[in-house]
Amino acid sequence: IPYNPQSQGVVESMNKELKKIIGQVRDQAEHLKTAVQMAVFIHNFKRKGGIGGYSAGERIIDIIATDIQTKELQKQITKIQNFRVYYRDSRDPIWKGPAKLLWKGEGAVVIQDNSDIKVVPRRKVKIIRDYGKQMAGDDCVASRQDED
């Protein structure tokens, strides 16, 4: 282990804190091993303070939960990026679009049409997968003629 005086101070501070907690809980535990486990638990989950008033254990759990939520949201975003939306406004029978799908919920979708962001009921929306330019009509016709 490389010499690092700052980390040595952190370790010494933690040892001092754990010794203090062990002194408080020693009479409640039959074995020293149990007292050490109790002290570590108390230090990680019961002592609040620092960032946001969380305990150390709550902070790490919050970090992990946030990371999982971020990954799930990124998955959902990549799923709906390739969709185009055609929609109708109120009583106007003419379909408008294509607009970019931002969010798809149970009863409504959020779309971006030019710079406008709108919430439209699902019943007034047609969601179509955008296959990109490789499926454009002229290219398909040309490739089919080449196959014959």
Curated annotation (Swiss-Prot):
Residues annotated as domain Integrase catalytic: 1-64
PTM comment: Specific enzymatic cleavages by the viral protease yield mature proteins.
UniProt: Mg(2+) binding residues: E12
EC assignment: 2.7.7.-, 3.1.-.-
Keyword Transferase: yes
UniProt xrefs under Gene3D superfamilies: Integrase, C-terminal domain superfamily, retroviral (2.30.30.10), Ribonuclease H-like superfamily/Ribonuclease H (3.30.420.10)
Stored InterPro entries: Integrase_C_dom_sf_retrovir, Integrase_C_retrovir, Integrase_cat-core, RNaseH-like_sf, RNaseH_sf
GO molecular function, one term: DNA binding
Domain of life: Viruses
GO biological process, one term: symbiont entry into host cell
Record flagged with keyword Nucleotidyltransferase: yes
Keywords recorded for this protein, A-Z: AIDS, DNA integration, DNA recombination, DNA-binding, Endonuclease, Eukaryotic host gene expression shutoff by virus, Eukaryotic host translation shutoff by virus, Host gene expression shutoff by virus, Host-virus interaction, Hydrolase, Lipid-binding, Magnesium, Metal-binding, Nuclease, Nucleotidyltransferase, Transferase, Viral genome integration, Virus entry into host cell
Residues of the DNA-binding region: 83-130
This protein's name: Gag-Pol polyprotein
Gene it is expressed from: gag-pol
